[in-house]
Amino acid sequence: MAARLSLRDYQLGLSARLQRAETDRGAASKLGLEAGGGAWLVDLTEAGEMIPVPPISAVPLARPWFCGVANIRGNLYSVVDFSAFLGGEATAVTDQARLLLISDRFRAGCALLVDRSLGLRKSGELEPRAAGAESKWTRAEYTDTEGKRWRELNVPALVRDPEFLDVSV
């Protein structure tokens, strides 16, 4: 019972820290990740959590970018290789590879397989770019203080897109 209480305390503390990070001016407000050689940002309200890649059960007759399903704490999540979905190379499952669980508020039950997590990014360090959106899932584009290009993922548009929802061959 003590382990459950400790886990709950940890989750409450983490939730409070994330809320403070969102409300603080110039604080980290977007999760950075790397997929297909590109840097992506995800709004914290649209991300569930980032976890190491668990065992994934393949699904027959599925598109190449659909990895299969994973059991995460008793819940089944469909796993999409984000790089392959975008038309790039398949993501190698390494020690750095991660699954980004999409927020439960979308009721999508899905996770994106990405190359690695790049941590939280401060809004004050990102300069909006004038360039048009590269895909219908790109909300905005930014450049950081080091000149690196970032694309912000539009999660609601992604999880409602018919192409994303159709995993059968």
Describe every region a protein language model picked out.
Residues 1-169:
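An acidic, low-aromatic, low-complexity terminal/linker signal
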